[in-house]
């Protein structure tokens, strides 16, 4: 609901043309400007203030904010005082009454008009999305989808963030069958561990040993909430989340490096640096997987890092040379 609609719904019911014509007193004409203040907890905070991303408690829908009209410094009047002033003005200048009546009729009609915006229908959104895909892509490219029905042989494995703004298939125009994609909070790759993070380990193993991907990309992005959490969560002490803090600390070495080398830099700038450094940490963690190291030695696999800046519309790509050597025996 717009501020104007909310104001109209809270306005007294006597504000209409007919009631003013019958009133024994009137008010001065003029433009009464109002501002609206929302008595809720959604005030913006400084970018340097550490955010509390997730609370370890149920989150419920917030109640509708209380919207109250406050008159600007033009008059500094209460609502009732403004109405009384309007009545007084109309008594003194009766010729303004038709103009005021017409304007009030317009406001009343606007307030009474139904909201024509249809409510969001998630099922309809999914249906229409699939229909669009099928008619514009699936039906128009039968050769591709016939081939995909036989199996997949992607050249790329991509680690990307779960952030809804950075879908790698959209950003990099990957076609179906072209990239084996893993998405998680802050696009992180944990080190090899058979008991923890097995979902990531299984994906890497399948991509390298079975799909025979040739490239593994780890792609960070601008304004990453997971990285901001990493930079602002305390390194020690009790957690405020069930999963997030433990997960983002996979790239704690990136935070440590940024803080050590850029202490005193604004938090926003530190986050940008950490977004890229965390990619390098993940690339390093990939080296802890034996089959990844084997692929690098045999030159059947390459690792690359990237950073997508959706604010400025730029993309950085880099490769790391780890200088791996063949094992020696003594």
Curated annotation (Swiss-Prot):
InterPro entries membership: Beta_CA_cladeB, Carbonic_anhydrase, Carbonic_anhydrase_CS, Carbonic_anhydrase_sf
Enzyme category, top tier: lyase
Database matches in PROSITE patterns: PROK_CO2_ANHYDRASE_1, PROK_CO2_ANHYDRASE_2
One Gene Ontology term, aspect cellular component: cytoplasm
Keyword list, A-Z: Cytoplasm, Lyase, Zinc
Pfam assignment, any one: Pro_CA
Gene Ontology biological process terms in this record: carbon utilization
Highest taxon above the source species: Eukaryota
Stretches for region Chloroplast transit peptide-like: 1-109
Catalyzed chemical reaction(s): hydrogencarbonate + H(+) = CO2 + H2O
A single MF term (Gene Ontology): carbonate dehydratase activity
PANTHER family attached to this UniProt entry: BETA CARBONIC ANHYDRASE 2, CHLOROPLASTIC, CARBONIC ANHYDRASE
Family under the similarity heading: Belongs to the beta-class carbonic anhydrase family.
Stated name of the protein: Carbonic anhydrase
Native species: Flaveria bidentis
């Amino acid at each position: 609901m717009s501020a104007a609609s909310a104001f109209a719904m809270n306005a007294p019911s006597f504000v209409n043309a007919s009631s003013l014509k019958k009133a024994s007193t009137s008010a001065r004409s003029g433009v009464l400007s109002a501002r609206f203040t929302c008595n809720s907890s959604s005030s913006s905070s400084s970018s340097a203030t550490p955010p509390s991303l997730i609370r370890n408690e149920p989150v419920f829908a917030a109640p509708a904010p209380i919207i109250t009209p406050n008159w600007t410094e033009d008059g500094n009047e209460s609502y009732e005082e403004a109405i009384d002033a309007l009545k007084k003005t109309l008594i003194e200048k009766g010729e303004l009454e038709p103009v005021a009546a017409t304007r009030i009729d317009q406001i009343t009609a606007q307030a009474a008009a139904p909201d024509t915006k249809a409510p969001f229908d998630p099922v309809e959104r999914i249906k229409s999305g699939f229909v669009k895909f099928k008619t514009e892509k699936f039906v128009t490219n039968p050769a591709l989808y016939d081939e995909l029905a036989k199996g997949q042989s992607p050249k790329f494995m991509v680690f990307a963030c779960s952030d809804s703004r950075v879908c790698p298939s959209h950003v990099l125009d990957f076609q179906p069958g072209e990239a084996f994609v893993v998405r998680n909070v802050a696009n992180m790759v944990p080190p090899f561990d058979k008991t923890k993070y097995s979902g990531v380990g299984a994906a890497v193993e399948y991509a390298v040993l079975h799909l025979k991907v040739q490239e593994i990309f780890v792609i960070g992005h601008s304004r990453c909430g997971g990285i901001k959490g990493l930079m602002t969560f305390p390194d020690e002490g009790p957690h405020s989340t069930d999963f997030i803090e433990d997960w983002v600390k996979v790239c704690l070495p990136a935070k440590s490096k940024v803080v050590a080398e850029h202490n005193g830099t604004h938090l926003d700038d530190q986050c940008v640096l950490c977004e890229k450094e965390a990619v390098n940490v993940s690339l390093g963690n990939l080296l802890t997987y034996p089959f990844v190291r084997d692929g690098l030695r045999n030159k059947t696999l390459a690792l690359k890092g990237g950073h997508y800046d959706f604010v400025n519309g730029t993309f950085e790509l880099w490769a790391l040379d780890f200088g791996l050597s063949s094992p020696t025996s003594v």
